[in-house]
């Protein structure tokens, strides 16, 4: 079964998205430790990005995942992506999500440009984790990838 890890800075919206992909749109609490859902997907604490001493824990956590979803808030002007993180595991799929697009100070265009500059390619998803319609775009994309992999004979992501 394919596994997904959600990574990003403190307050980026990882846990909100992690929960929303399973239909839970309630207010997320701060993630204090690595959390797994019933499919083995991983929600990582933002502190793993904020403090270099935790990078080893982040890299170790990501070893067994197939897809890395990087969540970056639309009102965050800086990249906090640890150097080399996109190079961990050569076969990993990298997906970028611009979160908090509904915030008054959101700058989606600048955030998209920043994500492209640090190595992400389209599609880059723009969403509000509390809006089922915007989350649906990502769910549909993951389901389509799962179908493609299934047709190719690979194990599938759980939708």
From Swiss-Prot:
Keywords noted in UniProt: ATP-binding, Bacterial microcompartment, Kinase, Nucleotide-binding, Transferase, Virulence
Cofactor: binding comment: Does not need divalent cations.
GO biological process: ethanolamine catabolic process; generation of precursor metabolites and energy
Residues the record lists as binding ATP: 8-15
GO molecular function, one term: ATP binding
InterPro entries: EutP_PduV (IPR012381), P-loop_NTPase (IPR027417)
Membrane-spanning segments: none
Localization: Bacterial microcompartment
Pfam families: PduV-EutP
UniProt pathway annotation: Amine and polyamine degradation; ethanolamine degradation
The family this protein is said to belong to: Belongs to the EutP/PduV family.
Function: A putative bidirectional acetate kinase that may drive flux through the ethanolamine (EA) degradation pathway under anoxic conditions found when this bacteria infects host intestine. It may generate ATP that can be used by other enzymes (EutA and EutT) in the eut pathway. Can use GTP instead of ATP with reduced efficiency. Overexpression in E.coli yields elongated protein sheets; prevents artificial BMC formation by eutS alone or by eutK, eutL, eutM, eutN, eutS in E.coli. Expression of the eut operon allows this bacteria to use ethanolamine (EA) as a carbon, nitrogen and energy source. It relies on cobalamin (vitamin B12) both as a cofactor for the ethanolamine ammonia-lyase (EAL) activity and to induce the operon. EA enhances bacterial survival in macrophages in a concentration-dependent manner, suggesting it is an important nutrient during infection.
Name listed for the protein in its UniProt record: Probable acetate kinase EutP
Organism: Salmonella typhimurium (strain LT2 / SGSC1412 / ATCC 700720)
């Amino acid at each position: 079964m394919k596994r997904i890890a959600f990574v990003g800075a403190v307050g980026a919206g990882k846990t909100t998205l992690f929960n929303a992909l399973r239909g839970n749109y309630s207010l997320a609490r701060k993630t204090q430790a690595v959390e797994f859902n019933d499919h083995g997907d991983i929600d990582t604490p933002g502190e793993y990005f904020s403090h270099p001493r935790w990078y080893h824990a982040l890299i170790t956590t990501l070893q067994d995942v197939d897809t890395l979803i990087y969540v970056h808030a639309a009102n965050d002007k800086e990249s906090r992506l640890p150097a080399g993180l996109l190079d961990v595991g050569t076969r990993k799929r990298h997906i970028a999500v611009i979160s908090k697009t509904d915030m008054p100070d959101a700058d989606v265009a600048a955030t998209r440009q920043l994500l492209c500059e640090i190595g992400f390619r389209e599609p880059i998803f723009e969403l509000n984790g509390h809006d089922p319609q915007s989350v649906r775009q990502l769910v549909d994309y993951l389901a389509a990838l799962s179908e493609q992999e299934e047709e190719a004979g690979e194990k599938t992501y759980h939708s």
